[in-house]
Swiss-Prot record:
Protein name: Chorismate pyruvate-lyase
Pfam families associated with the record: Chor_lyase
Originating gene: ubiC
Any one GO BP annotation for this protein: pyruvate biosynthetic process
InterPro entries membership: Chorismate--pyruvate_lyase (IPR007440), Chorismate_lyase_/UTRA_dom_sf (IPR028978)
The protein's assembly and partners: Monomer.
Length: 165
């Protein structure tokens, strides 16, 4: 199953050099903390619509493959993050199978829980980078995060109703 917002997310083109961003854009796109928490700070109830979840083969990755270890399988989770029922963000998380051991096995059990609620409670979370991308008028970002040193890739597309615009 797919969703039009996830098609747009996969169409993001990333800037080779960090673009100059006005403060409202940079405040959202370069946020180091939880996007879920940021949405909740807007006074919104955040919910998850789960679109896809399960293992994919390496061949299903596009340019993401260059940012992750070479493995045969990856855990994929694609969601829409809603604020008071309105879609604000499309998210795609790709987790190498080798990351899914120990406490990180919980990444497969999130269900309707926003990823940020899990990630940002971990004292072992680090971020390698944030890449800024754009598809027509929509902005997005991609980050390689690490839990206990183990990588995962998170891509987020800000939808038209989000406060970024």
């Amino acid at each position: 199953m797919s969703h039009p917002a996830l098609t747009r997310l996969r169409a993001l083109r990333y800037f080779a050099v960090m673009p100059s961003l006005a403060p409202p854009l940079s405040d959202w796109l370069l946020l180091e903390d939880s996007m879920t928490q940021r949405f909740e700070q807007q006074g919104k109830q955040v919910t998850v619509t789960l679109i896809n979840e399960g293992y994919i083969e390496r061949e299903a990755l596009t340019d993401e493959a260059a940012l992750l270890p070479d493995e045969p399988r990856y855990w994929l989770r694609e969601i829409i993050l809603n604020a008071d029922g309105e879609p604000w963000l499309a998210g795609r998380t790709v987790v190498p199978e080798s990351t899914l051991c120990g406490p990180e096995l919980a990444l497969q059990q999130l269900g309707q829980i926003p990823l940020g609620r899990y990630l940002f409670t971990s004292s072992t979370l680090t971020r390698d980078f944030i890449e800024i991308g754009r598809d027509a008028a929509l902005w997005g970002r991609r980050s390689r995060l690490r839990l206990s040193g183990k990588p995962l890739l998170l891509t987020e597309l800000f939808l038209p109703a989000s406060p970024l615009y």
